[in-house]
Amino acid sequence: LKAIFNAVGRYCPSLAVSVSLLLTVAPSTAVAAATSYPLTLKNCGQEVTFKAAPTRTASIGQSTTEILYLLGLADKVVGTAVWIGPVIEGYEDVNAKVPRLADNDPSFESVVATKPDLVTAQFQWHVGPEGIVATPKQFAELSIPVYVSPADCAAKDNSAGGDGVRHKSFSMELIYQEISELSEIFDVQDRGEALIAKLKAREEAARGKIANADGKLSAVFWFSSAEMDIDPYVAGTNGAPGYILSALGIKNVVSTEEEWPTIGWETIAKADPKIVVIGKMDRRRFPADDWELKMKFLKSDPVTSLMPAVKADHIVVMDAQAMNPTIRTIEGIEVLADAVEKAGLAK
């Protein structure tokens, strides 16, 4: 089972096929209406107006940048920042041509220096009322419109900074809204509709793989830890992992509505999750960002090493981007469904 579960996080033939289908977004048979400019949208509580399709976009956040790539808009991206892992498969060459303003948080000056006519952001933590890069007002003073992913502001309070508090469970509909609105802003609605249709089809296929598992399994998602020997950041019910588990009929042993609460391993062990999902990322802000250190900890710690899921090697390595509210969340559903199916846990 170890080979089955760990390999899924790095390579999965069925997943590779699914991703390859996504990489080229063909126009749908029905022709969507063209955008009528000026276009005004309400985004994260603010009205944003576009006089024409943007030609120079500074994109702060990996997911939103990847959406722009998938919509065939890479040539409109003049700078990007905040990446925690490799670009979506098939877009390595495209991404290499886009200037990286910063792997993590860019400065306001570096964003403005790209001379953007649009700034997109994945998180209000970066561009929002308390944004550490800037506030929308700062960009507005330079006549630069801002678009923030609806997944980070709908039914969510970011006023205290950090991960914020999500008052309603995340749904992929928020990502589909982002795709739809970005495609309207850039007047590529046909591409947006085709991309959404493919993502929905992939989710439906993944759900069908382990339909018999409904209510039989439980899991915990471990994103990272500030230090290896303190309580880990694990997924609550209202974030992307909650959506993944709900889609597959798997119980989350963490019942709090917080997105990423810290919970002790003793408490987690008592809940006895049948599967442990660990995040894989390039980011190294914390020691536990390294998935291999997570794996080593699970197998050597006096508490976690005795957990039945760990002893049975029911550990799934998953791209951390799938654990955030992103287009990769669909990939997370596929990875977990494939792991459960191949291990025979859905029977």
Residue ranges of model-derived segments:
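Short helix-initiation/N-cap motifs at beta->coil->alpha
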Residues: 41-45, 98-109, 152, 257-265
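A short, structured surface patch at a secondary-structure boundary
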Residues: 58-114, 118-129, 250
